Amino acid sequence: MSRPEQQLKKMLKTPQAQYAFYPTAKVERISTTQHMYFIATRPMFEGGRNNVFLGHQVGQPIIFKYVSKKEIPGNEVIVLKALQDTPGVIKLIEYTENAMYHILIIEYIPNSVDLLHYHYFKKLEETEAKKIIFQLILIIQNIYEKGFIHGDIKDENLIIDINQKIIKVIDFGSAVRLDETRPQYNMFGTWEYVCPEFYYYGYYYQLPLTVWTIGMVAVNLFRFRAENFYLNDILKRENYIPENISETGKQFITECLTINENKRLSFKSLVSHPWFKGLKKEIQPISELGVDYKNVIT
């Protein structure tokens, strides 16, 4: 048995893996033109359009993402290649395909969880939530400067290193080219995060939509997952603004979630909002990424 195969089997025995894959996961080989990999047979995540598996290459845990060709084209590969060196964006290591699937081989972030599960059982303190949202704005700004819009910003598409509190954006299956001037009539993201102008009029502009989704992520960081607010709650004028945060925090959320998109905060003004006063405008890397996996492989 090769060392990568041994390492993956060890990972599958950890409590984290037992929870994610169940004890039935086994290890199989998969070859590309460049490398031999080992992959768990049970997915970490099963979605309507893709399945995500844990894998291993020499010295490095990795993620396999299988995207159905019937559901969506291979745009995610094009976008990830264009964003390859963009801070805060998950890295594409390699790409292959078969008759049914686009297969993306993506970096694995140890000690991480998606933001949805990070605040599943707890409400975040304002200081931590504010830093997460500020990181998110900076990352989206970097994506914007490369000429793209993510298209599906939500808790599940953000992963956080639970030790360093650093986030990365994942799942670019809904990403499209940036077009600031023309209305968009197709919604590729998640319905619960849709902006009210699309709900009412059937169109939206990309940057006001982005501001809306950032506001949705922000307001839900202060709630248990089971209490998450979505568009319908806000349209009903439910009291969605967290009580125990600063006035500038309340102002930020209110101005991001303004029903009238013309009165909503502009995307370019987000980074200079008073709520983020004193925070550094830089995206910290997750230290020793791709090198030190001693906390995962035991």
UniProtKB/Swiss-Prot annotation:
Its EC number is 2.7.11.1. It is found in: Virion; Host cytoplasm. One of its GO terms (biological process) is viral process. One of its GO terms (molecular function) is protein serine/threonine kinase activity. Keywords: ATP-binding, Host cytoplasm, Kinase, Late protein, Nucleotide-binding, Serine/threonine-protein kinase, Transferase, Virion. GO terms for cellular component: host cell cytoplasm; virion component. It catalyses: L-seryl-[protein] + ATP = O-phospho-L-seryl-[protein] + ADP + H(+); L-threonyl-[protein] + ATP = O-phospho-L-threonyl-[protein] + ADP + H(+). The active site is at D152 (proton acceptor). SMART domains: S_TKc. Residues 38-276 form the Protein kinase domain. PANTHER family: PROTEIN KINASE DOMAIN-CONTAINING PROTEIN (PTHR22984:SF25), SERINE/THREONINE-PROTEIN KINASE PIM (PTHR22984). Belongs to the protein kinase superfamily. Ser/Thr protein kinase family. Essential for viral replication. It may mediate the virus progression through DNA replication. This is Serine/threonine-protein kinase 1.
